[in-house]
């Protein structure tokens, strides 16, 4: 009976190992395999984002770019009314010392009432990275809508729930 139990445990370990990619971080594995709503979503690429951020800071990049980032929510602001409607803002920590503001157009999002994100939540975000200066930068267009100036829809996945 013991060899059978060992075989079952070994088979389970091998099966689980097949689900985890050999490269990438735990968030990538989580997003890729455990989030059905995010399965069709682009994987997060914090490294690419940080490279783009450095390019903006040095003047090598001047136009907004599409980014896919993931991390932990560290702060949630109250909703704010702007000239383009109600927006929700939160800070997403990508890695130690790297935090970016996420902007969501609440009128465009298919989401519950704000705040639908809380401190400590895991989030994956796809949207437009804008950089005006060191203190004015963030990721917006995190919703399904597009315009003539930005043609790529975005989204936010919070703890496995996708909002567009």
State what each model feature region is:
Residues 1-9:
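Bacterial N-terminal signal peptides that target proteins for export
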Residues 10-18:
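Bacterial N-terminal signal peptides
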Residues 26-164:
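OB-fold and OB-like single-stranded nucleic-acid-recognition modules
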């Amino acid at each position: 009976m013991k060899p059978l139990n060992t075989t079952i445990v070994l088979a389970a370990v091998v099966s689980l190992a097949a689900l985890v990619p050999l490269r990438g971080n735990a968030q990538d594995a989580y997003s890729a395999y455990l989030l059905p709503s995010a399965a069709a979503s682009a994987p997060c690429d914090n490294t690419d984002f940080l490279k783009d951020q450095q390019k903006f800071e040095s003047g090598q990049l001047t136009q907004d770019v599409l980014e896919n980032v993931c991390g932990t929510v560290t702060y949630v602001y109250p909703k704010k009314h702007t000239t383009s409607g109600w927006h929700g803002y939160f800070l997403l920590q990508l890695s130690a010392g790297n935090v970016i503001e996420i902007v969501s157009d609440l009128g465009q999002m298919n989401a519950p009432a704000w705040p639908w994100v809380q401190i400590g939540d895991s989030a994956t975000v796809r949207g437009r990275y804008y950089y005006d200066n060191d203190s004015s930068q963030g990721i917006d267009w995190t919703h399904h809508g597009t315009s003539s100036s930005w043609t790529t829809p975005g989204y936010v996945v919070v703890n496995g729930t996708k909002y567009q």
